[in-house]
């Protein structure tokens, strides 16, 4: 993650239309194979390897290939993860976002669910977003400490 942090510091990344989307989440290492497929290793915080070929990174790879004139609309690339799972990534079209060239990718492949989390809050819960000790004990909570 050190590499990601250093790159982000040197090259700030901000979405052209949604400034809240900023920074770099993952780092993808790529290697072109003799078979034309791209081998990938995507590192996610705090340093885990993604078991999939990473749809976000594969889309970014497709965009970089298009920007360098190495792929045209209608063409497909294959990205393969460290465990061998594959995505077929097709350049469906080219468009514009905030005055910048953007691509329209289609990603096909297979994924497996390995977890699910459900977080709920009751609308009548006055502490639904959490609480601090002073919320429960009041502003004079410190006076309860005989040494305090």
Feature-to-residue mapping (PLM):
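Active-site proximal loop and beta-alpha junction motif in alpha/beta enzyme cores
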Residues: 1-148
